[in-house]
Design a protein with these regions (language model features):
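Asp-box/WD-like beta-propeller blade repeats and closely related beta-sheet repeat scaffolds
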Residues: 103-117, 134-172, 182-210, 214-215, ...
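Bacterial N-terminal signal peptides
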Residues: 3-16
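Beta-propeller blade repeat segments, especially FG-GAP/WD-type strand-to-loop junctions
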Residues: 22-30, 85-100, 137-151, 192-207, ...
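Short, conserved, GDST-rich strand-edge loop motifs in beta-rich repeat architectures
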Residues: 185-212, 316-373, 421-431
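Repeat-based blade/solenoid architectures
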Residues: 38-63, 105-117, 157-168, 213-215, ...
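Hydrophobic beta-strand segments that make up the repeating blades of beta-propeller
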Residues: 29, 74-81, 126-133, 180-184, ...
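Gly/Ser/Thr/Pro-enriched helix-cap/hinge segments flanking short amphipathic alpha-helices
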Residues: 17-32, 46-50, 396, 427, ...
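Beta-propeller blade termini
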Residues: 61-71, 90, 113-123, 142, ...
């Protein structure tokens, strides 16, 4: 999983990115982590091991999660760390945050934490917290309701020691309790720490990572009494291993939540939920080809047709970049960053290269993959209805380079959902900008990161320290979206690899909006899986209350609609997970509505 390629930063970026502070923007975003009181810094394992790369270096970074842990109506942030402990920041409601980690008891020092998700698994009205790690096992924290958490992992039946990635809570059998789906990668290290060398013991060499025995995914059924039972084999969800994320949505609208599980090394899988506790792989007849090296995935309606689409970002197919000793691929990458190629070798070879077809097909066959099931780049699956999709990433303008995490939201409140993509490698010393893909409203996107305050990064493109005598570049890994200050505009927060996070305060001109915080009664209390549709004149919009997703991240579960200049909403239709339909007529705009699931 670790990439030990070495590349140099692009000259066209260096010139504009070494100023200590990016200029203030009149519109767009403004980076304000320091001003907001967020002092967290993600530290990676080389700090523990000195400046020497070890195979156990986990360069996929750590995640973050958003949730209102203290029920004060404000979204709080939990940052994950590889070294030195995680951090929980309480939202004070005035644009600032306070570190409450020690009181809450959720630091988990000594672990290599990866991702986390807030969820009220026992429906007691308080958001609990589940954390995945690659050292010492995953942890379920029960929220006591007094600002503190209790480790109930063993009692809940969720003890798992391995190399876990994303975890999502969703109610797959519609019994009103949130079940847990856990993604895992491969056994690329042991769970042993060598105190003599300071190393987290790994495999012998990097080449073992793609073929090492895989850790399969897990599905835990919520028994409704605070415990869980492993139902993976019965459900048919072991998967193919090397999964780093999962997207949850009812793609065919049959009333049961389905799963898309991307793979870091191979084809992804769309699982159809039968409604009887089992899942079936329907990828071939629904999505067709899937990205070979997918990292993050997100569900949203990109074209405003009222149907939920699926976006998958593929980082590992860009590994051709920087593999040449002279780093000549840097300019090629800049020139071809929005193109898709025929293999992970990128533009260095194509179908005219002698032996290309035979060699590439043989390579994937050796890895147990069918070349004809793969594509090499991002994938945007447009939902055509009736369980059918068509892939549109390139024409939509969403083919990007070095993508990791993806977060979506209507950042300028114009009625169209935009996309934020974290990018770059950091190690090996290669900077690539984050992407802010603004929705044009016609099914296409344009990158406005530089124009709207996302790029260049505050403090320049390099980190303070060096690794192996060379400067390390900044690199964002995961991102979340939420209206942290309650002004109807969505902020973006990232967790950056071996660096400080970004807190992008929204400075777009104020426009009309409406928000809904949903509470389930018959359905799960978090209302995960609820679909909300809005009609305003001839405009229809759809949002889903989603669990974690996008790559090691959990964004807000508050449903946000930007309205642009529209002065009223005609109606809202809410489809709750257990099938109850609810309609709201002409709700007030520019406010947050609290909505409870009706009895019927």
């Amino acid at each position: 999983m670790t990439k030990l390629t070495v590349a140099v930063a692009a000259a066209w970026l260096i010139a504009g990115c070494q100023h200590p502070k990016a200029p203030a923007r009149v519109t767009g975003f403004q980076e304000r982590a320091q001003e907001a009181g967020i002092a967290f810094r993600m530290h990676d394992l080389p700090k523990e091991q000195g400046e020497q790369f070890h195979i156990n270096l986990y360069d996929h970074g750590s995640g973050l999660a958003v949730g209102d842990y203290d029920n004060d109506g404000r979204e709080d942030i939990y940052f994950l760390n590889q070294l030195g402990g995680n951090a929980l920041y309480r939202n004070m409601g005035d644009g600032s945050f306070v570190d409450v980690t020690a009181k809450a008891g959720v630091a988990l020092p000594g672990r290599v934490s990866v991702a986390a998700t807030f969820a009220d698994y026992d429906n007691d009205g308080w958001e609990d917290l589940y954390v995945t790690t690659t050292r010492g096992g995953n942890v379920l924290f029960h929220n006591r309701g007094d600002g503190t958490f209790e480790d109930v992992t063993a009692a809940a039946g969720l003890r798992y020691v391995g190399h876990s990635q994303a975890a999502v809570f969703f109610d797959y059998d519609n019994d009103g309790y949130l079940d847990l789906f856990l993604t895992n990668t491969g056994r690329w290290t042991t769970d042993t720490f060598d105190s003599a060398t300071g190393a987290y013991v790994g495999k012998a060499d990097l080449g073992t990572t793609m073929t090492t025995p895989r850790e399969f995914n897990r599905l835990y059924h919520n028994n409704g009494d605070g415990t869980f039972t492993d139902q993976t084999d019965r459900a048919g969800l072991r998967g193919r291993g090397w999964a780093g994320d999962v997207a949850v949505f009812d793609y065919d609208e049959d009333g049961f939540l389905d799963l898309f599980v991307p793979s870091m090394f191979g084809r992804g899988q769309l699982y159809h939920n039968s409604g009887h506790g089992t899942f079936t792989d329907v990828t071939a007849q629904t999505l067709g080809r899937t990205p070979y090296g997918a990292i993050g995935s997100k569900v949203f309606d990109y074209d405003g047709d009222g149907r939920l689409d699926l976006f998958v970002v593929d980082m590992h197919s860009d590994m051709w970049m920087g593999l040449d000793a002279q780093h000549l691929s840097l300019e090629t990458a800049r020139r071809t960053q929005h193109q898709r190629f025929l293999s992970p070798l990128g533009p260095t070879v194509d179908e005219t290269t002698p032996g290309f077809t035979t060699t590439v097909r043989a390579l994937f066959a050796k890895l147990g993959e069918d070349y004809n099931t793969l594509l090499f780049g991002n994938a945007l699956y447009r939902n055509l209805g009736q369980g059918r999709f068509t892939e549109t990433a390139a024409p939509a303008g969403l083919e990007t380079l070095w993508p990791w995490g993806v977060a979506t939201g209507d950042f300028d409140d114009d009625g169209n959902e935009d996309v934020f993509i974290t990018s770059g490698m950091g190690y090996p010393f290669y900077y690539w900008p984050n992407q802010l893909m603004m929705n044009n409203g016609d099914g296409t996107f344009r990158d406005q990161a530089a124009a709207l305050g996302i790029e260049p990064p505050t403090g320049g493109i390099y980190l303070e320290e060096k690794v192996g005598g060379k400067p390390a570049a900044r690199s964002s890994r995961s991102a979340v979206v939420a209206d942290f200050d309650g002004d109807g505009r969505l902020e973006i927060v990232t967790n950056n690899f071996n660096g400080r996070p970004y807190y992008f305060a929204n400075r777009f001109p104020r426009r009309n909006y409406v928000e809904f915080r949903l509470t389930g009664t018959k359905s799960n209390r978090d209302a995960i899986g609820t679909v909300v549709r809005l009609w305003a004149g001839n405009k229809v919009m759809v949002r889903q209350v989603s669990p974690a997703g996008g790559y090691l991240a959990q964004s807000t579960r508050v449903v946000h609609f930007g309205l642009g200049d529209r002065s009223q909403v005609d109606s809202i239709a809410i489809r709750w997970p257990r099938g109850i339909m609810q309609t709201l007529r002409n709700p007030a705009i520019n406010t947050l509505h609290e909505v409870r699931e009706p009895a019927r």
